[in-house]
UniProtKB/Swiss-Prot annotation:
Function: eIF-2 functions in the early steps of protein synthesis by forming a ternary complex with GTP and initiator tRNA.
Entries under InterPro entries matching the protein: eIF2G, eIF2g_C, eIF2g_dom_2, eIF2g_GTP-bd, P-loop_NTPase, Small_GTP-bd, T_Tr_GTP-bd_dom, TIF2_gsu
Residues where Zn(2+) binds: C58, C61, C73, C76
EC number: 3.6.5.3
Needed co-factor(s): Mg(2+)
Renumbered residue ranges of the record's region G4: 146-149
Name of the protein in question: Translation initiation factor 2 subunit gamma
GO molecular function: GTP binding; GTPase activity; metal ion binding; translation elongation factor activity; translation initiation factor activity; tRNA binding
Record organism: Methanococcus maripaludis (strain C7 / ATCC BAA-1331)
Annotated gene: eif2g
């Protein structure tokens, strides 16, 4: 079980740009996840945003009115008890940021697909995000039909029917569809009830060797800080198995690129965990669930501006090898989703350049050999990954990377 300050489950907020993912996250958590200056300017999410909330229940009111994220019951003002703490991963919906969404999907135990009732369904990234969840094995999905305050009842029903048609034959075929107005906070109690019912907390085994997917990394020092006041680099991400505690040594792979003569290789970084935190609260140990900040002894230059995002961290000597070549068993989709004309997907070809997402890392590779059941890919940036891990595969079509399927590392 995660420490009491920790979230138990990570839920992705996915969907087409501007359909209300960030607004819905804010309504549930009180946190506006677009805090990056460029995001505020452009009004879209660029990096992964994180925010936590507690689902609470009033003991006296009937369902669904009894569910809330507030300190008191919304219906009667009475006492509430906490059922579960959850973390939202707010993924960008813009097509040029698909790689960021794919790296976020590896952290998700379940997902909420946000679809605006005010637009035709499906929009390109609605399709692409659903395919990504399918490809990366995210099975517990809820659909939020947002912006119902902007349409008539007839239009909302027509949009609902479009959603049903669109999800047929996908991982979300039987997903509940919940009409919501994030702007007015309407029907959030119904959504909270559905999260409790349809997105379970995964069973975690804390005795396994710990592994942490690094999604962000920071230099938390302010410019002009005194040397004695400088803090070590901070990494942020999700523990996917096992548990880490303050004082543990930590190995981070692939690590640092070292060039000697005309040869380049990667050296893992080893450091010590100085602090663990979640949502501003300190922890002595951390288990799977939620998004954890890990304070280290690293030079902040190594962690600034997400320099270590995409890494895998764990106890020294326990991580898988760093791969500069990858052999995968590909499973390709039938058609390209997310583009206007849905082209048939051709098999992988030798010397083709592909974008690959494994864990939270994004890399580009060239296929050295390609058969229907096996492809070998030489990576531009190495990754640290295990046999059996899923890899999302994207191909450049026109000027954009498009998801074409996934592979299993052999």
């Amino acid at each position: 079980m995660a420490a009491s300050n920790q979230s138990e489950v990570n839920i992705g907020m996915v969907g087409h740009v501007d359909h209300g993912k960030t607004s819905l996250t804010r309504k549930l958590t009180g946190v506006w996840t677009d805090t990056h200056s460029e995001e505020l300017k452009r009004g879209i999410s660029i990096r992964l945003g994180y925010a936590d909330c507690e689902i609470k229940k009033c003991e006296t009111c009937d369902e669904p009115e009894c569910y809330t994220v507030d300190k008191k019951c919304d219906a009667c003002g009475g006492k509430v008890s906490t059922l579960r703490k959850i973390s939202f991963v707010d993924a960008p919906g813009h097509e040029t940021l698909m790689a960021t969404m794919l790296s976020g999907a590896s952290l998700m135990d379940g997902a909420i697909l946000v679809i605006a009732a005010s637009e035709e369904c499906p929009q390109p990234q609605t399709k692409e995000h659903l395919m990504a969840l399918d490809a990366l094995g995210v099975e517990h999905i809820l659909i939020v039909q947002n912006k119902i305050d902007l349409v008539s009842e007839e239009a909302a029903i027509e949009n609902y029917n479009q959603i049903k048609e669109f999800t047929k034959g996908t991982v979300a075929e039987n997903a509940p569809i919940i009409p919501v107005s994030a702007h007015h906070g309407a029907n959030l109690d119904v959504l909270l009830k559905a999260i409790q019912e349809f997105i379970p907390t995964p069973e975690r085994d804390e005795t396994l060797t710990p592994k942490l997917y690094v999604a962000r990394s920071f230099d938390v020092n302010k410019p002009g800080s005194e040397i004695k006041d400088l803090k070590g680099g901070v990494i942020g991400g999700s523990i996917i198995q096992g548990a880490l505690k303050v004082g543990d040594d930590l190995e981070i792979r692939p690590g640092i690129k070292v060039t000697e003569g005309n040869k380049t290789h990667w050296v893992p970084i080893v450091t010590k965990i100085i602090s663990l935190g979640v949502g501003g609260k300190k922890l002595k140990s951390a288990a799977p669930g939620g998004l954890i900040g890990v304070g280290t002894e690293l030079d902040p230059n190594l962690t600034k501006s997400d320099a270590l995002s995409g890494s895998l961290a764990g106890l020294p000597g326990t991580l898988p090898e760093t791969l500069e070549k990858m052999v995968i068993k590909p499973q390709l989709l039938e058609r390209v989703v997310g583009s206007q004309d849905e082209l048939i997907i051709e098999p992988l070809k030798t010397n083709e350049v592909l974008m690959l997402n494994v864990g939270t890392s994004t890399t580009v590779g060239v296929t050295v050999s390609a058969r229907a059941d096996k492809a070998e890919i030489k990576l531009k940036l190495p990754v640290c990954a295990d046999k059996g891990d899923r890899v999302a595969i994207s191909r450049k079509i026109g000027s954009r990377w498009r998801l074409i399927g996934y592979g299993i590392i052999l």
